Amino acid sequence: MQTNRIEQLSVPANTVLHGDCISIMRSLPANSIDFILTDPPYLVRYQDREGRSIQNDSNTDWLIPAFTGAYRVLKQDHFMISFYGWTQIDKFIHSWRSAGFRIVGHLVFRKQYASKSRFLRYQHEQAYLLA
């Protein structure tokens, strides 16, 4: 596997890192990551038909530490795409901006299925392009 040597740490090239993002990013050197794609908990207290839920989907404590860590490890003039929960967009935007990110684009993806809601059928996912 090809690696890039940065500040005595080795960052694997073309690698997906899976785990607790705050812990993983603490171990990475600043300005070492080319691109971040994140689909974090949406803060909507999601529960599926079988009653399963998503960890930290009602807890906002991780927002600012996670996005501050992402900003620290992302190389200057590179991008992060972050999905978000539209009902909590104010919290996501505040966290992104507090970390130092600029919003430079908005992406909308059509889904093949509809999410349950009270008034509308949600058939799309959204993400922001951040720099």
What does each model-identified segment do?
Residues 2-131:
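Core catalytic lobe of class I
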